[in-house]
A protein has these predicted regions:
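Surface-exposed, short loops/turns at beta-strand junctions within beta-sandwich domains
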Residues: 2-11
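Detector for glycine-centered tight turns/loop "hinges" at secondary-structure junctions
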Residues: 9, 22, 184-185
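Short, isolated positions in well-ordered beta-strands
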Residues: 12, 25-27, 208
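Extracellular recognition modules
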Residues: 13-17
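Residue-level signal for short segments within beta-strands and strand-turn junctions
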Residues: 18-20, 191
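Extracellular fibronectin type III
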Residues: 21-34
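Short, surface-exposed polybasic-aromatic patches that bind anionic ligands, especially phosphate groups
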Residues: 35-446
Length: 446
């Protein structure tokens, strides 16, 4: 059952019970009761009041906004890939815009929302190697277990975590997984997740998972984290390069059922330009550097730095022009495809933001169908080709329902870099452990 926030700040999930032989006992038909199945429903979502719901109608535009729109349209599929640094031809192919889901394509980060205050919460055992791009300035005081800051992080990203039995990370690509606990307020992110491992059990028989990288933020319990984390940033680590809880910008089956998306759309760049590069003595590229825009904290831009003046960057907000009519595509004279129409409406009000790179084609992402399958007991992914969501979007031709290749990148507008960044920002760009990076102080404030 959904959680409710009590006045003292604690979040509880309701536990269903049934009367058997005169006694009230936990219901036998409740699947994974601590799983908050309606967390992304547009009527009471966990992204409420965060940066993903800010109005973009008055967003100040970048001086080269038009050039960026043209660049985004031109450079998907990605014409460079990663081979250009070796002087080789590479890049992507196919449609200009793709949709990724748990049923097809490169699977996006799988997000699970739980309420660990529920008495029947299920747990898993996580072994995570590192928090990756650490917050600058972790306490390096030596302890028998290692540097004090790293030891503290491990207590959050490793060990027992509240995760429903049967949970799966993305099954290909980055194998990402998010775990948002609205009972404690701890939101975790993981990259390169494997599990549940068939040949291992945790200390108390729990399923075991491993992750190459993890991250987290500590927030107010409940569905509204905007007081403590309005920008939806991780405090350390990540599941994707932006170091954000970017699955808040994914498309959920409940949103298609409701016919509305009430948040900005987090997409994956096909191509995004690096801002600079390091070269060896022979002039060969040995390292690329990307500069993100707030609220992103890092970038893995892969396209040539010469493209940077026209390329948006990770974390930079964009929007679809308000004069775009979802029922009229000027390139075809026909209405945009059904799902594209939903994306256009959301992007006109809340915007779009690139939070990762695939060096292939621009792609929007859906929430994994696995959490819903666990909550309902259904065995078919709602995103299945010709499945439930496909038939809602396009009853006559459900096999075409997920075609968003007509998304109008050429009709987008791009905001200034760091739009909305606090005048004093104690959340610096990510860097190596103990790097000397000072908090950001706006010139307006100095």
């Amino acid at each position: 059952m959904p959680s409710k926030l009590l006045k003292d700040g604690r979040a509880y999930a309701l536990q269903a019970r049934e009367k058997i032989n005169g006694a009230w006992v936990p219901s036998s038909y409740v699947n994974h009761p601590a799983l908050v199945a309606d967390a992304f429903h547009p009527d009471n979502p966990i992204y409420q009041n965060t940066i993903f719901t800010r109005d973009v109608s008055k967003m100040p535009l970048h001086p080269n906004s038009a050039g960026m729109a043209a660049w985004m349209h031109k450079n998907s599929p990605d014409p460079w890939g990663t081979a250009w640094v070796k002087g080789q031809k590479g890049g992507g192919w196919g449609a200009k815009t793709a949709l990724n889901s748990s049923a097809f394509g490169t699977q996006p980060i799988a997000a699970y929302v739980v309420d660990s205050t529920h008495p029947a919460t299920e747990y898993a055992w996580m072994e995570c190697k590192t928090d990756g791009m650490s917050t600058v300035g972790w306490d390096a005081t030596p302890t028998p277990q290692g540097p004090k800051g790293i030891v503290a992080v491990q207590k959050i990203i490793s060990g027992l975590i509240p995760l429903p039995t049967g949970a799966l990370p993305a099954q290909n690509g980055d194998r990402g997984m998010s775990l948002y606990d609205i009972g404690s307020g701890i939101w975790r992110e993981y990259f390169d997740v494997h599990g549940p491992l068939p040949d291992r059990k945790g200390p108390n028989g729990e399923p075991v998972y491993t992750a190459g990288v993890g991250g987290f933020s500590v927030n107010d319990p409940g569905r509204d984290i905007s007081r403590t984390n309005p920008a939806a940033q991780t405090q350390s680590g990540q599941s994707a390069v932006a170091c954000m809880h970017n699955s808040l910008g994914f498309i959920h089956p409940d949103e298609v059922r409701a016919g509305k998306i009430n948040h900005a759309l987090a997409f994956t760049f096909g191509a995004v330009a690096a801002t600079s590069a390091d070269y060896d003595a022979q002039g060969r590229v040995i390292r690329l550097h990307g500069t993100p825009s707030w609220p992103a904290a890092a970038s893995d831009a892969k396209a040539p730095p010469s493209e940077a003046p026209n390329s948006p960057t990770h974390g930079q907000w964009g929007r679809v022009r308000k004069d775009v009519d979802p029922m009229h595509n000027p390139l075809t004279g026909l209405p945009y495809n059904p799902l594209t129409r939903m994306l256009i409406v959301a992007a006109q009000k809340y915007g779009i933001v690139g939070t990762d790179t695939n060096a292939f084609v621009h792609a929007f992402n859906t929430h994994s169908g696995v959490p819903e399958m666990l909550a309902t007991g259904k065995t078919t992914d709602p995103w299945a080709v010709n499945g439930e969501i496909a038939k809602i979007l396009n009853p006559a031709e459900p096999h075409k329902a997920f075609d968003i290749s007509d998304f109008p990148w050429h009709l987008t507008e791009w905001g200034i870099r760091d739009w909305g960044r606090p005048l004093v920002d104690f959340y610096p760009r990510r860097a190596a452990l103990n790097s000397n990076v000072d908090p950001y102080i706006s010139p307006e404030y100095r």
